[in-house]
Amino acid sequence: MAESELQLVAQRIRSFPDFPIPGVLFRDISPLLKDPASFRASIRLLASHLKSTHGGKIDYIAGLDSRGFLFGPSLAQELGLGCVLIRKRGKLPGPTVSASYALEYGKAELEIQKDALEPGQKVVVVDDLLATGGTMCAACELLGQLQAEVVECVSLVELTSLKGREKLGSVPFFSLLQYE
């Protein structure tokens, strides 16, 4: 990984204590999105990892609603791939499949269009941040319903203390930046 590019990305992540509730340290990617050089570096670094790990053996990038949409299409473009969207319930037209996941106070659902992928296609799931792993795990379940193969999940930021990586089980996971 190009250390100077990684430093450029890391410098554009800000921390806000006690947001959105007391005791939470929020990692804000807004400065990264505002700076074209940093954003470009984040995409290049993720793409470089995927190329070296999987070569040309990825068919699609799947972006998670909503901030995965910021990275998914750009990453797909960098790799010369298409991007499919995994949305929150009720946001996609046509036939869909869904998977639910737990939130702190209740549950939520993700959906993907039934015709988004063919069985056996190889997919990388991307989001901005991995916390508890609930959303990413639900995305993997959805892709499994379509008989797609999740070859890896990636994110810009990983909050290691929340152990989301463990929830993914045997699915490989990669993040550019790790914080407690």
Swiss-Prot record:
Task: Return the broad EC class.
Answer: transferase
List the molecular function annotations (GO) for this entry: adenine binding; adenine phosphoribosyltransferase activity; AMP binding
As for subcellular location, the record says:
Cytoplasm
Cross-referenced Gene3D superfamilies, in alphabetical order?
A: 3.40.50.2020
Task: Write down the EC number.
Answer: 2.4.2.7
**Reaction(s) the record says it catalyses:** AMP + diphosphate = 5-phospho-alpha-D-ribose 1-diphosphate + adenine
On this chain, the residues bearing N-acetylalanine are: A2
Phosphotyrosine modification sites?
Y60
InterPro entries attached here?
Answer: Ade_phspho_trans, PRibTrfase_dom, PRTase-like, UPRTase/APRTase
Where are residues bearing Phosphothreonine located in the sequence?
Answer: T135
Keywords in alphabetical order? Acetylation, Cytoplasm, Glycosyltransferase, Phosphoprotein, Purine salvage, Transferase
The source's domain of life comes to Eukaryota
Residues where Phosphoserine is found: S4, S15, S30, S66
- One Gene Ontology cellular component annotation held by this UniProt entry: cytosol
Pathway per its UniProt entry is: Purine metabolism; AMP biosynthesis via salvage pathway; AMP from adenine: step 1/1
Where N6-acetyllysine occurs, the residues are: K114
**Which GO terms are recorded in the biological process aspect for this UniProt protein?**
adenine salvage; AMP salvage; GMP salvage; grooming behavior; IMP salvage; purine ribonucleoside salvage
Q: What is its main location?
A: cytoplasm
Q: Which family does it belong to?
A: Belongs to the purine/pyrimidine phosphoribosyltransferase family.
What subunit structure does UniProt give?
Answer: Homodimer.
Q: What does this protein do?
A: Catalyzes a salvage reaction resulting in the formation of AMP, that is energically less costly than de novo synthesis.
**Could you tell me what this protein is called?**
Adenine phosphoribosyltransferase
**Organism (species):** Cricetulus griseus
Question: What broad taxonomic lineage does this protein's source fall under?
Answer: Eukaryota, Metazoa, Chordata, Craniata, Vertebrata
